[in-house]
Design a protein with these regions (language model features):
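Extracellular glycoside hydrolase catalytic/binding regions
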Residues: 1-130
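Aromatic-rich peripheral "rim/lid" segments of glycoside hydrolase catalytic domains that contact
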Residues: 110-188
Length: 188
């Protein structure tokens, strides 16, 4: 069984500063909403009462509009963090897995909520992670469970994301002369 620790720290350079040689891989959580010091959630005013109905109502009322007002800005925050995480992982020779990721952390499957903007960010995150070549395991979103009907009803989207993940080529830094990564890849 691979030895890892799940991280969602903002400063991925810590992987370079701290001895992580005992880890087989980094399981790093990355969400757009946490970038730039939680800027998105601050603008939504989603800081107190997480998991309370009032907090979710703020998300429903504000989040999609906020994203759609500056989609390229929010997308760049996400892709910059994914690329940086990939670069740092490459420097220290550790593959990446992400199991919680990409767009928004908390989104309810309430009636009539639009999932298109969430899927847009999640597709971007999935594609960007795959392109780095450093991810050996990629979740498509924070909403991979079938209880999220809003995500699961789009079978084609999931098939497209799965095809991207399965066809992603791994970087030579984890496939050639990397004993730790080779051991891990053999187990996967």
């Amino acid at each position: 069984m691979p030895f890892l620790f799940s991280f969602d720290c903002w400063d991925v350079h810590k992987y370079e500063e701290v001895d992580t040689s005992f880890l087989d891989l980094f399981e790093h959580h990355i969400w757009m909403v946490h970038q730039n010091n939680n800027e998105f959630y601050k603008k939504v005013d989603y800081k107190d009462g997480q998991f309370l109905p009032e907090a979710y109502k703020k998300v429903v009322k504000v989040a999609e509009k906020l994203y759609k007002a500056k989609p390229l800005y929010w997308q760049k925050l996400l892709t910059d963090k994914i690329k940086l995480t990939g670069e740092v992982a490459k420097k220290v020779g550790r593959p990446l897995v992400t199991t919680e990721c990409w767009g928004i952390v908390d989104y309810k499957d309430w009636p009539l909520l639009n999932w298109d903007w969430v899927k847009e960010l999640c597709a971007l995150g999935t594609v960007t992670a795959a392109q780095t070549g450093m991810w050996v395991g990629i979740a498509t979103s924070n909403f991979c469970g079938p209880q999220f009907v809003g995500m699961w009803r789009d079978v084609k989207w999931h098939q497209e994301m799965t095809a991207i993940i399965k066809s992603a080529e791994l970087d030579e830094s984890i496939t050639i002369n990397n004993e730790i990564a080779a051991k891990l890849l053999k187990r996967l």
